[in-house]
Amino acid sequence: MFSHLPFDCVLLLLLLLLTRSSEVEYRAEVGQNAYLPCFYTPAAPGNLVPVCWGKGACPVFECGNVVLRTDERDVNYWTSRYWLNGDFRKGDVSLTIENVTLADSGIYCCRIQIPGIMNDEKFNLKLVIKPAKVTPAPTRQRDFTAAFPRMLTTRGHGPAETQTLGSLPDINLTQISTLANELRDSRLANDLRDSGATIRIGIYIGAGICAGLALALIFGALIFKWYSHSKEKIQNLSLISLANLPPSGLANAVAEGIRSEENIYTIEENVYEVEEPNEYYCYVSSRQQPSQPLGCRFAMP
């Protein structure tokens, strides 16, 4: 079971690595400027990190077909029609492409090279270029409100009175458009930050699970080794105890059994003779040592 754990951890990390980049689609028309947002938050003011923009999806390392690159201080490489519109010193590394054509369609990679292993933030932004729409030039409408102030006529018993309310305030469409763009960029930046944070949390969780499984495997191997060593040690101690048993005890036990069998007997001999009617008998006591002479008693009639 444990042999499959390292392989599963590698697959999990590869899956998280491949799904790290996000893809968002943006549209523009031929002849317009295309805007591809990309943001990050510097750790401290002026503490910048390298950023690269490339044509094509984000590879495992760096950017492919680099069109713009920054370092910790300034923009050190760019090609024509590609430039940064925002303040990159504050983390705004959004790319602007001037006067786009149909050939500019495709996926662009924004890679924020944060120091550390697998800490880079990768964003794949799909740019779709549409042909320009042919529309008649709009005629400029005259602001009649500004030219003719509103008149309020009151009728009463006396002569009619005319009051001037003044012209309505002009609405600056340029300011409204700029505000809408800023709100859109802010919303996109928040979405990108949330996506990056979610992916990073997923990677940390996967790495933690792999580390926990590896530690469990190591502890299991150590416990198994300790158990085997303890069992072998107990067997060795048992053999040593049997080998160290005093031989005298075993020999004494055997000799005692033999001696008991030899000493428990009685020699009785009766001699019946016509010529000598005397009888005699001998006995051996169980307490008498084998080396002592036999004790015999004679009985006379």
UniProtKB/Swiss-Prot annotation:
Glycosylation sites: T145, N172
Tissue expression from the record: Expressed in T-helper type 1 (Th1) lymphocytes. Expressed on regulatory T (Treg) cells after TCR stimulation. Expressed in dendritic cells and natural killer (NK) cells. Expressed in epithelial tissues. Expression is increased on CD4+ and CD8+ T-cells in chronic hepatitis C virus (HCV) infection. In progressive HIV-1 infection, expression is up-regulated on HIV-1-specific CD8 T-cells.
Pathology noted in the entry: May be involved in T-cell exhaustion associated with chronic viral infections such as with human immunodeficiency virus (HIV) and hepatitic C virus (HCV). T-cell lymphoma, subcutaneous panniculitis-like: An uncommon form of T-cell non-Hodgkin lymphoma, in which cytotoxic CD8+ T-cells infiltrate subcutaneous adipose tissue, and rimming adipocytes in a lace-like pattern. Affected individuals typically present with multiple subcutaneous nodules, systemic B-cell symptoms, and, in a subset of cases, autoimmune disorders, most commonly systemic lupus erythematosus. A subset of patients develop hemophagocytic lymphohistiocytosis. SPTCL transmission pattern is consistent with autosomal recessive inheritance with incomplete penetrance.
Sequence ranges on the Extracellular membrane side: 22-202
Family designation: Belongs to the immunoglobulin superfamily. TIM family.
Chief location: membrane
Entry's localization field: Cell membrane; Cell junction
Post-translational modification: O-glycosylated with core 1 or possibly core 8 glycans. Phosphorylated on tyrosine residues; modestly increased after TCR/CD28 stimulation. Can be phosphorylated in the cytoplasmic domain by FYN. Phosphorylation at Tyr-265 is increased by stimulation with ligand LGALS9.
Single Gene Ontology MF annotation: transmembrane signaling receptor activity
Keyword terms, alphabetized: Adaptive immunity, Cell junction, Cell membrane, Disease variant, Disulfide bond, Glycoprotein, Immunity, Immunoglobulin domain, Inflammatory response, Innate immunity, Lipoprotein, Membrane, Metal-binding, Palmitate, Phosphoprotein, Signal, Transmembrane, Transmembrane helix, Ubl conjugation
Chain's gene name: HAVCR2
Record-linked InterPro entries: Ig-like_dom, Ig-like_dom_sf, Ig-like_fold, Ig_sub, Ig_V-set, Immune_Mod/Transcr_Coactivator
Annotated effect of mutating Y82C: In SPTCL; results in dysregulated secretion of inflammatory cytokines by macrophages; affects protein folding; decreased localization at the cell membrane
Covalent lipid adducts (S-palmitoyl cysteine), residues: C296
Record-listed Phosphotyrosine modification sites: Y265
Protein name: Hepatitis A virus cellular receptor 2
Positions of Ca(2+) binding: G116, N119
Topology term for the membrane: Single-pass type I membrane protein
Keyword Amino-acid biosynthesis: no
Transmembrane segments: 203-223
SMART domains on file: IG
Effect listed in the UniProt record for changing Y272A: Abolishes TCR-induced NFAT activation
Outcome (variant: Y265E): No effect on TCR-induced NFAT activation (phosphomimetic mutation)
